[in-house]
Curated annotation (Swiss-Prot):
Gene: rpmJ
Keyword line: Ribonucleoprotein, Ribosomal protein
Protein name: Large ribosomal subunit protein bL36
A GO BP entry: translation
Listed GO CC annotations: ribonucleoprotein complex; ribosome
Similarity comment text for this entry: Belongs to the bacterial ribosomal protein bL36 family.
UniProt keyword annotation of DNA damage present: no
Keyword Ribosomal protein assigned: yes
UniProt superkingdom: Bacteria
Pfam families, per the entry: Ribosomal_L36
Gene Ontology molecular-function annotations: structural constituent of ribosome
C-alpha cells in the first residue's frame, strides 16, 4: 500500500473507492498498484 498525495489509476483494472473519507485504489489482478490518499 502506497500512501500518496494524489492517487490515479495505473491500469484498467484499478478501482477508486472512498472509505472513511479516504480515497483508495484497489486492484485485484495486480495488488502492487494499491494506493491510499493522505
Amino acid at each position: 500500500m502506497k500512501v500518496r498525495a494524489s492517487v490515479k489509476k495505473r491500469s484498467a483494472e484499478c478501482i477508486i473507492v472512498r472509505r472513511k473519507g479516504r480515497l483508495y485504489v484497489i486492484n485485484k489482478k495486480n495488488p502492487r498498484f494499491k494506493q491510499r490518499q493522505g
